[in-house]
Regions:
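Active-site HxH/HxHxD metal-binding segment of metal-dependent hydrolases
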Residues: 67, 71-138
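Short linear motifs at secondary-structure transitions and domain/linker junctions
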Residues: 16-21, 26-29, 54-55, 78-82, ...
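Zn-dependent metallo-beta-lactamase
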Residues: 1-48
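Pre-active-site segment of Zn-dependent metallo-hydrolases
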Residues: 24-38, 48-78
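Short, conserved beta-strand segments within well-ordered enzyme catalytic domains
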Residues: 43-45, 51-52, 80, 104-105
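Generic hydrophobic/packing signal
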Residues: 41-42, 56, 62, 90-92, ...
Length: 138
């Protein structure tokens, strides 16, 4: 699902929404289809450049997101992380590889939270978490 608002002809935004499985437990038998959550990112763009708000959790959805961004024909300059939950920043590595001109930014408390959320356990499950050498505080 995508939602667009283009009231300002110089600045545009669009939501990119995808469902993913969740860690919901204790669902009654036969109701397993209810164990999902929605992830949403926002792309804001002008004439040439774009800013992305948050990322996705997994590689498949992040690849789909990167394809969607490329289709806009703008240069992704910034990825802003709103908070340190894995489903908002685990796609950062793939996006920074795909868009080498982009920089990741977040408030210092968000960076600290992200750092705490990337223990060895997560790395074993999903691989490298983020391009921390390119992460900048705002």
């Amino acid at each position: 699902m995508k939602t667009t608002d283009s009231r300002d002809p110089m600045l545009h935004w669009e939501l990119f929404i995808r469902q993913r499985g969740s860690a919901t437990q204790g669902v009654p038998p036969g109701k397993e289809a209810l164990t999902w959550v929605a992830n949403t990112v926002t792309l804001i763009w002008g004439e040439r450049d774009a800013l992305l708000v948050d990322t996705f959790l997994g590689d498949a959805q992040t690849t789909e997101l990167a394809d969607w961004i490329e289709a806009k024909g703008r240069t992704l300059r910034t990825i802003y992380l709103t908070h340190g939950h894995p489903d908002h920043f685990f796609g950062l590595t793939l996006l920074l590889q795909r868009f080498p001109q982009a920089r990741a930014v977040a408030r210092p408390n968000v960076v600290r939270r992200c750092e705490r959320r990337r223990p060895r356990t997560w790395s074993r499950i999903i691989g490298p978490v983020a391009g921390w050498d390119r992460f900048q505080n705002v």
